[in-house]
Amino acid sequence: MITHVEFTLTGPAHGRPFAADATYQATGQPQPVVVFLHGFKGFKDWGHFGLLADFFAEQGFVFVKLNLSHNGVVVGGTGDLEDLEAFGHNNFCLELDDLGQLLDALHTPGATPLPPTLLDLKRLYLIGHSRGGGIVLLKAGEDPRVRAVATWAAVADLHPRWPAEILADWQRAGVLHVPNVRTGQQLPLYYQLAENYFAHLPRLDLPSRLPRLRQPLLLVHGEPDETVPLTAAYQLKNQKPDAELLILSDAPHNFGGAHPWLAAQLPGPARAAAERTAAFFAGLA
């Protein structure tokens, strides 16, 4: 029987609570742990992510997913993007620190409702989608507790290559708005996002950090990805030549999913990505 447990963490620096959940099948034996990170404008309960959790639980993993603290989702709220002010104050260091706090909590008995005997934390794996892929690569590089990483449709660089004129206008106005096509919202991005990136470049420069990544890496990308081109996967592969690259011929950026996702099964491309990822993790010594 699949068990689903929800819990809340609070960032010690920013004081903002954020939700996480774990899905698993109790077998009486410690199980490897997969932590899944959503991307830009995403959240832990988007679309088919709940079915992903069930799939990995059926494969013998404890599957943990979280809402980043400043992704716009409110604990106890609608479950969708609603706190646009928080969204606007998100930055890459916050995301890394939120993920790090979750990893710390998993290693701290009593910090989550999960029994310590359930977790085989010597087999701790990360999956990141889209921008979340870039974040999990950086986190693995700074946290040796991570055993291996898989990215799905990951960006090759957190630097969006803002043109100089856009940066200048953004700095003058203090805020830049980007559309959320799904909801029709105009999402604010405060200039602190750019300031945070440039102030912490040694930590956030993925092209310079990825070649030093020691953990095994699986790169999964769709050939028809309409948001992050397939060239990003080739760039990541060039920076870490020993990474395994899986190209799915039929996988758009969200691997066939949509929000809400009403079907009882995973979309085909998402299942293909999940099957290969589960096998990749299970095959590691």
Task: Identify the residue ranges that each predicted region occupies.
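N-terminal cap/lid segment of alpha/beta-hydrolase-fold proteins
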Residues: 1-28
